[in-house]
């Protein structure tokens, strides 16, 4: 439960107790609920910040402590890495999903701060995909159409994202930066979030003629 700070703080110690040690954390789980300027509220922002910003920071903090404990116990080579999944929309703004976007922007900034604070034992890298998976808000046909909106003919795939995360975890020279793995989809200007474009088009087509 990422809304429960005690549960979040207890997660990594439970993993370590089961597996013995841990080298990396990939923060990929995210809350993604729609709001905009008209419906924005303290409650919506706080909910997203807890899940999408505070939880990844606490897990990075816990990994750093675990690596420090290993080093203190004699593991001179103890190192760790954190990968935070972000979103290309941070570089291609639209007014939808305001609280989600703010929470991801805060996580991107936190990545830079953590890269400085947790060095040299723990590296922190962001990975920002484009439209990768469909949702209940998009038909298969609409997803295929939107996925093709990229200078390279398609957006990222799960395999693209996984390969980039693996690269970030293995390359010891990368920290404090974000790898955009969106096939430059961020360069395609859109007026609304991809996940809503199908629904909005449908509502427009079904609207009665005045």
Give residue spans per PLM region.
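Catalytic loop of short-chain dehydrogenase/reductase
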Residues: 68-106, 111-119, 131
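Conserved Rossmann-fold SDR core element
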Residues: 21-23, 108, 117-132, 174-181
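C-terminal substrate-recognition "lid" of short-chain dehydrogenase/reductases
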Residues: 159-181, 186-187, 192-193
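Rossmann-fold cofactor-recognition segment
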Residues: 1-5
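Substrate-binding pocket helix/loop in short-chain dehydrogenase/reductase
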Residues: 36-49, 146
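A short, exposed helix-loop element centered on a Lys and neighboring polar residues
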Residues: 60-61, 112
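Conserved NAD(P)H cofactor-binding loop of Rossmann-fold oxidoreductase domains
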Residues: 28-34, 184
